[in-house]
Each structure stands twice: as C-alpha cells, then as structure tokens.
C-alpha cells in the first residue's frame, strides 16, 4: 500500500518521466528480442505509442500485487470463497477510490474513474489467483 501511495504522490511530470523510461526500456528489450536495430528516434516514437498502455498496466499490476498480498493471509486464516472475494475486493476497491481521491491534491494529477476500474480489476485478478493457488495447494500438499 505504501508503494501505491508513493507512486500516487508523484507529480504529473515525475510520474510521466518514470512511465516513459519504462516504455523506452520495453521498446529496447523488444527490439533486442526481434533483432531490430532501433535508433534513438525510433525508440522515442515506439515508446510514445505504448506509453498509455504501460501506465495502465502499472495500475493493474500494483493492485494485482495488493490483491494477492491481502488475500493470501485471509485465505490462510480460513476466509475463503465468496467471503474472501467480497472482503478483499471491497477493501481493494475502496483503497483504489481513496488513491484516486489523493491524486486530487498532487500537482498536475487528477482522479479518474477508469483508473479505479483498472485497479479493482487488478486486485480481483490477484484475489482469484489466491483462490487458484489455494485450491491447487489443497489438492497437492495437504
């Protein structure tokens, strides 16, 4: 949760620079994997094209980790099935809403309902991953 809060506390310029750096690294990695020799201008063009996707995948990934790390202990303490999804899902969705509200007070940032939906989808994915891991673990370990 601290990691999410820290990223949300970055100004629009700081956040944009960080996600653009990640976009450039992705383009360079894909260029190496496909044996493409990309010059600096091409890297910039391709990075601009995937920048939005990288930003939204970062939202999804942060909350996927939150969903996993929140639901795993709950699962271990026998909160399972519908109640696990409900409790962890509501907590994560509420935190996503508060996170977007927090961005109202950061320079150049604004809240977006789309981001809350993406965040919630990421956390629900993490929660269901916990359920799958738990189901497989019960069948093989215990």
What are these regions (language model features)?
Residues 46, 50, 87-90, 114-117:
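Alpha-helical membrane-protein architecture signal
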Residues 77-86, 109-113:
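Membrane-helix interface segments
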Residues 62-76, 121-137:
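Membrane-interfacial alpha-helical segments at the cytosolic side of multi-pass membrane proteins
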Residues 138-142:
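Short, charged juxtamembrane terminal tails flanking transmembrane helices
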Residues 52-66, 113-121:
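Membrane-interface loop-to-helix entry segments
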Residues 1-62:
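"…centered on the first transmembrane helix and the immediately adjacent amphipathic helix/loop
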Residues 1-2, 84-103:
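Small-polar-interrupted transmembrane alpha-helices in polytopic inner-membrane proteins
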Residues 96-120:
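Interfacial helix-loop-helix junctions of multi-pass membrane proteins
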